[in-house]
Amino acid sequence: MNIVTGKQESVYDLIRSMSKAEKRNFKLYATRLSGNQEAKFISLFDCMDALDEYDETKILQRCPIKKEQLPNMKAHLYKQILVSIRLLDAQRTVPIQLREQIDFARILYDKGLFRQSTKILEKAKEQALFYEQYTQAIEIIEFQKRLGTLSVSRGLVAKSETVSRQVAELCTRIKNINELSNSGSQLYGLYLKLGYTRTQKDIDLIIQVYGQKLAKYEACDEGELSFTERFFLYQANAWYNYILHNLLLCYKYVCRQVDHRQQRPERFG
């Protein structure tokens, strides 16, 4: 019989990563469920939580589970743990809160309660824009457009134009964030692969590919860039100057990034 020990196992790794509060919340969540199947996966959770390393032999000895049942039980446990963590994090994680509000709005929409759906979406959009969750903000606006077509009014055309401009602006924000975060990641990857630039040819190449791109954003006024755009700009500039061995400038941008982050610590959980 092929028994696995010391193997990387997704559900075991997830359990080991859980905080005490998350484990306690899972146990409370699990006890609300009923049935023999649920009792088995709670037993599996307790067994895995007690192990110092993943060991199927010990699991099968200690849990009322047959070997052929184990894969399905682990998959079920994995899903239920994620559900319980999602419920716990819903009150403190903005993207999860927004996802929940969008889902609520969709339920109301499907039931024909358009006014209630619109009210929830408006609050969710305000929250998404405040926390710069632009992808979800666009999803909300597109949903609002669908609701808007159900109420014909004189102001519909003007409102439609405003919404289109807002979506275009958010798409630009997302494009900028992706470009800046990708630049930082690419520069970090180059440093790991090659280290500091050693020749003038390497220096010229880095400046040509990344210098002009970052300078374009540096030229923007303070209010032109969002909090997230500016954060990734500082991060990319730090790696840009580090790989060029401009350590004083690198230090300057690292300090800016730290100061910038401290302005809105709630953005980083």
Where on the chain are the PLM-derived regions?
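Start-of-helix signal in alpha-solenoid helical-repeat scaffolds, especially tetratricopeptide repeats
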Residues: Q91-R99, I138, K145, I177-S181, ...
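Tandem amphipathic alpha-helical repeat scaffolds
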Residues: F104-D110, E142-S151, S183-I203, F231-N246, ...
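TPR-repeat structural position
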Residues: F114, Y134, R154, L247-L248
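Amphipathic alpha-helical segments of tetratricopeptide repeats
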Residues: E122-F130, R165-T172, Q208-E222, V254-E266
